[in-house]
Amino acid sequence: MGGLKRMYVIVYGIVQGVGYRRFIQIHAARLGIKGYAKNLPDGSVEILAEGYEEALYKLLDQIKRGPPLSKVEKVDVKFDDYTGEFASFDTY
């Protein structure tokens, strides 16, 4: 397994009002990932996630897929150094 990393993601498309953040929260918890998913005013969702690199890539697969009612059109991803600032994965 790779080392600990931070992943910052902005997801565009039909991702608000369709259970998207909860979907990501469930998958993050299963993968042992900490951080948050937050709705942004422009209709996109911001995700900040920390965990093992392999787990983050598995979460990224779910981020791109989304729940059944969502339609992910674009995903911007940036990796950075792990900070350890989160104790859980929350939604806002």
UniProtKB/Swiss-Prot annotation:
GO terms for molecular function: acylphosphatase activity. Pfam families: Acylphosphatase (PF00708). It comes from Sulfolobus acidocaldarius (strain ATCC 33909 / DSM 639 / JCM 8929 / NBRC 15157 / NCIMB 11770). It comes from the Archaea. Keywords: Hydrolase. It catalyses: an acyl phosphate + H2O = a carboxylate + phosphate + H(+). The keyword Hydrolase applies. Residues 6-92 form the Acylphosphatase-like domain. PANTHER family: ACYLPHOSPHATASE (PTHR47268:SF4). It is an enzyme of class 3 (hydrolase). The active site is at R21, N39. Belongs to the acylphosphatase family. Its EC number is 3.6.1.7. This is Acylphosphatase. The lineage of its organism: Archaea, Thermoproteota, Thermoprotei, Sulfolobales, Sulfolobaceae.
